[in-house]
Amino acid sequence: MSAVIGGLVTALFILFGMSGFEDGSGDVTIREVSPPAEGESGDGAGPPVREVYTQSGPGVVSVDVASSEFGPSGGSGFVLDEQGHIVTNQHVVEGAEDVSVRFASGVREDAEIVGEDASTDVALIKVDASEGILEPLTLGDSDSVGVGEPVVAIGNPLNVGISVTTGIVSGVGRPIKAPNDYTIDDAVQTDAAINPGNSGGPLLDSRGTVIGVNAQIASESGGFEGVGFAVPINTVKSVVRQLITTGEVVHGYIGVSMFPVGIGELAAYTGLSKGQLADEYGLPENGAIVSEVASGGPAEEAGIEGGGEEEIEGIPVPTGDVVTEMEGKPISSADDVIEVVNSSKPGDRLALTVVSPGEEPRRVEVTVGVRPDDA
């Protein structure tokens, strides 16, 4: 990304650990609840915060981690089921040699890591807890969450103990960066205070159901400034199913790197009209530009090409193919491409419309592969 474009983004995205359904096996049950009926959500109605905390607080845990590389650290988590599975963030347990959890009752239990997925910042740990200790939370539907709805965040900020903060859903469908720099789609943005140690704790709606896993903030100062993000619970559901079943997560992959700025944004940044971009540089009116194609990857096999680079009003821009449509949906940015790929699975066939600069659109079909560990 050029300095011109990179300079437009000044906030830091900070991962906040703290330093210093049925899964198919027949023996694991995850509590889920249907979305509220139309008119039930978005009006601020629902149980008071104290009631939500009383209902859900016992299912939230502190996660304590020790490693020779990073020393002691920690975060939060919540009980998923009565078999002892606990959800937290991957960055909380990354590199951990010893993991333990502290329940709200004060009971401490050793935990083992079942699996981690850096691409979604989700990890699953497991405890062998005594009967009556585990109080699973109920999972909601993050796709039904609306801007303005009240939310409650519970966790262990700054290691002071399980605490509650409140706010609203400030935005939905936000793309955020995972620990491995992949994009997590559809994050829930909130102004509920999220501080070091909150990572891995639940973001709950007014009914006390989990709609996200608190993960990071955007900040220019390094402290909380009212912009926090939670991994959407629908993404978490898919990940934990795979972790429980196989201990790993498989992601779709087509083998392209995309220029972060879409054609529409490029026009705004350069001061050129879309017509000028078309006449002078052969670019279509909308789309996402391919900067690189992985050798031997699905996109290369389908005939999609990356390219060199040329300057447009001082901004270095790739000269690769432009993706204008995927699966019948218009594409306007790299995030649109990422969202389609993230929602696919290996073996799926994706129909794309691509344009090489100065040429007519063409249709290609890409067979989704398995994302390599080093991709």
Describe these PLM feature segments.
Residues 1-11, 15-279, 283-286, 295, ...:
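Serine-dependent protease modules
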Residues 267, 300-302, 309-314, 361-364, ...:
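Extended hydrophobic-aromatic, low-complexity segments
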Residues 86-87, 299-335:
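Conserved PDZ fold ligand-binding element
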